[in-house]
A protein has these predicted regions:
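Nucleotide-activated donor-binding/catalytic signature segment of Leloir-type glycosyltransferases, i.e.
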Residues: 164-193
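Short hydrophobic beta-strand element within catalytic cores of glycosyltransferases
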Residues: 228-231, 238
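Short beta-strand->alpha-helix junction loop in the catalytic core
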Residues: 86, 103-113, 156-159
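Conserved donor-binding/catalytic core segment of Leloir-type glycosyltransferases
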Residues: 115-132, 137-140, 151
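A short, active-site helix/loop in glycosyltransferases that binds the activated sugar's phosphate group
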Residues: 77-100
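A charged, aromatic-enriched C-terminal amphipathic alpha-helix characteristic of glycosyltransferases
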Residues: 12-16, 252, 256, 273-294
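Acidic donor-binding loop of glycosyltransferase active sites
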Residues: 200-214, 227
């Protein structure tokens, strides 16, 4: 049977979900199904098949625009959203029919727990730079804490060479700043398997997100690996990380956001090894690994 074609040069969250779906579902599941990832394009419709659009994008992306066209939506049999939040936003923005919509949350492969280093606190930021890296770096520098390091796994090459050629230059200065900042380890792009190995050693996923995440696989993986998540409540982050995450209110005034985030991060660092927090993280690991599973 024909299978949907994966985007070979992109290793973003959506594409990795796609690859895992192909891994876990047998070939016969795709019989008569045309599965379209993240692109509401007339050209991708196959009229003799069941057309399923798997939507990880937010409503502000150009690939979502055709969901406002009745002509296009009529050609779809199903629209699968990766969170209730994303579904609600599409209903609000495009009036997509609820009868054709379904929410299936993202999934990860089980992450085995390893005891974490008690002599230092390791923070990690392992998502694209435009989601809040500038603000995190500023907060981290200002906190200037002993025995705390920040590990940055962020790049534009994750979405392929073409994307990197167009967008990469814009983020060169922030990546250079990471390389030249005390107690910051800059890894650039790491394949997902290496990220998971690193997460097992990390204590806190520091994610002052200014981007409306529609799910946030990096947060799911972090929680499964026993990391505290300190993030904003923007987009679907609250849905994905509740009740375990530590949230600050998103604020368009970035000075306010940084102040608030700095307090929350400092508190989480200070209290990481408290009995109460360790009990919470144990429950978090078990819950996330079982609820976000394939």
């Amino acid at each position: 049977h024909s299978r949907p074609v994966s985007f070979k040069d992109s290793c973003g969250g959506s594409e990795n979900q796609f690859r895992l779906l192909l891994k876990y579902l047998p070939d016969e599941s795709f019989k008569d199904v045309n599965l379209i990832l993240n692109n509401a394009s007339h050209d991708l419709i196959e009229k003799d098949k069941i057309n399923v659009l798997w939507m990880h994008h937010f409503v502000n992306q150009k690939e979502a625009e055709n969901l406002g066209s009745k002509d296009f939506v009529d050609k779809l049999d199903w629209i699968v959203f990766n969170s209730n939040w994303n579904f609600e936003k599409h209903v609000y923005q495009f009036k997509v029919p609820e009868t054709k919509s379904i929410v299936i949350r993202n999934a990860i492969e089980k992450i085995n727990f390893e005891e974490k280093n008690k002599n230092k606190i390791s923070l990690i930021y392992h998502t694209t730079p435009w989601r809040g890296l500038v603000h995190l770096l500023k907060v981290f520098k200002n906190l200037n804490l002993e025995n705390v390091e920040l590990n940055v796994c962020s790049s534009t090459i994750i979405y392929g060479k073409k994307f990197d050629d167009i967008v990469g230059k814009k983020y060169k200065s922030i990546f250079d700043e990471c390389k030249n900042t005390k107690n910051v380890n800059y890894y650039g792009y790491l394949e997902n398997k290496k990220i998971i190995d690193l997460l097992k050693k990390m204590h806190i996923f520091a994610h002052p997100s200014i981007w409306p995440e529609t799910s946030c696989i990096s947060a799911i993986e972090s929680m499964a690996a026993g990391c505290e998540v300190v993030s904003t409540n923007l987009g679907a982050l609250y849905e994905t990380c509740s009740p375990f995450g530590t949230f600050v209110n998103f604020d368009r005034n970035f000075d306010n956001l940084e102040k608030r985030y700095s307090k929350a991060l400092a508190y989480s660092i200070k209290n990481f090894w408290s009995d109460e927090n360790q009990n919470k993280l144990k429950l978090q690991r078990e819950t996330i690994n079982s609820t976000y599973s394939w």
